[in-house]
């Protein structure tokens, strides 16, 4: 006689089974499962008890088929090497979880071709929305997807050649805060060290020029277009840097000189460098959360024109 135990796959319990166990109508179970009103606390408790007893789980596939949604979002970053990107992701992930969305993610290694391929692949898998930290350049490959209803939000950089929402740090305001700080310390010859990111460098440079002019300080375009090599010999007493990488480059380039440095965006160990580096800081997790909230509103039916949301910045003087 065999001692083998035969395993029988019992059918999964249905809402009809729950209704029968709880002694209520099928519609009542549906209301409880979907969090709809119209059920007394006592009845809801009885239905929830039946759900627990039977081990019932809602059929997400059927529900999503009815709504035409997949309850998934796609997040595409230009790189994972920057801790700022991970913080953006955390903020977005929290919002997605709160609203019942699963978040897919990928990175492009700052390659526009990979960005297009990855974005369209996520759209082909029917994500409900996209959040993108884009590479510079055109994003018109998303025009047809956005017109087809894929909610899309760009973060840290605005979209180019496509109409979509964007969430950015207040770059122009950040430049003005930095110049005000340096001018307040008595600096008159202030330079700007930009980077390859066209939008951010242009916006910060314009903010610097406005702030310098407002204070009657020299607006020298040569000093507002520095790179690390030119900074090493430039006639400046202070420099504002476009991002973390440029700030570190300025620290190396000005190591033998007494040049005051303010960076846009905080970074690890900035407070431990001698002398410590002042920064114009913004909260990347808040940027991710704000982008997620904006996307959820779009998915809920917000038809307002695309908007650009600016997250506030603050000076951390060191």
Predicted regions and their residues:
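Flexible loop/turn connectors
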Residues: 234-240, 245-318
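Short, solvent-exposed amphipathic alpha-helices that sit
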Residues: 46, 83-98, 174-178, 199-219, ...
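Hydrophobic alpha-helical segments within soluble ligand-binding/sensing domains
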Residues: 165-192, 226-229, 247, 282-300
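Short beta-strand segments enriched in small/hydrophobic residues
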Residues: 26-31, 65-80, 181, 189-195
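An alpha-beta-alpha
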Residues: 176-215, 307-318
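Amphipathic helical "hinge" segments at domain boundaries
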Residues: 56-121, 126-129, 209
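N-terminal helix-turn-helix DNA-binding module of bacterial transcription factors
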Residues: 1-70
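Flexible loop/hinge segments that line or gate small-molecule binding clefts
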Residues: 110, 132-177, 245, 265-277
């Amino acid at each position: 006689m065999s001692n083998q135990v035969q395993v029988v796959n019992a059918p999964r319990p249905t809402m009809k089974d729950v209704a029968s166990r709880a002694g209520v109508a099928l519609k009542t179970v549906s209301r409880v499962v979907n969090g709809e009103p119209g059920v007394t606390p006592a009845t809801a408790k009885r239905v929830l008890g039946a759900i627990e007893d039977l081990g019932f789980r809602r059929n997400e596939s059927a529900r999503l088929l009815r709504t035409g949604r997949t309850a998934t979002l796609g997040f595409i970053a230009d790189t994972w090497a920057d801790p700022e990107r991970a913080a953006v992701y955390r903020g977005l992930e929290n919002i997605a979880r709160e609203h019942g969305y699963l978040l897919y993610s990928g990175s492009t290694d700052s390659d526009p071709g990979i960005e297009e391929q990855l974005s369209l692949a996520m759209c082909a898998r029917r994500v409900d929305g996209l959040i993108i930290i884009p590479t510079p350049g055109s994003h018109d490959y998303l025009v047809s997807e956005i017109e087809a209803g894929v909610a899309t939000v760009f973060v840290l950089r605005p979209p180019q050649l496509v109409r979509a929402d964007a969430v950015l740090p207040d770059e122009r305001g950040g430049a003005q805060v930095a110049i005000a700080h340096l001018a307040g310390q008595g600096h008159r010859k202030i330079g700007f060290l930009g980077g390859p990111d066209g939008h951010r460098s242009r916006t910060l440079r314009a903010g610097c020029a406005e702030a310098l002019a407002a204070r009657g300080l020299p607006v020298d375009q040569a000093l507002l277009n520095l790179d690390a090599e030119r900074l090493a010999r430039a006639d400046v007493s202070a420099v504002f840097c476009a991002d973390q990488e440029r700030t570190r480059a300025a620290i190396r380039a000005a190591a033998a000189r007494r040049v005051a440095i303010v960076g846009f965006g905080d970074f690890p160990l900035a407070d431990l460098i001698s002398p410590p580096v002042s920064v114009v800081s913004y909260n990347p997790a808040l940027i991710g959360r704000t982008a997620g909230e904006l996307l959820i509103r779009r998915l809920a039916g917000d038809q307002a024109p695309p908007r650009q949301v600016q997250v506030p910045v603050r000076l951390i003087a060191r």
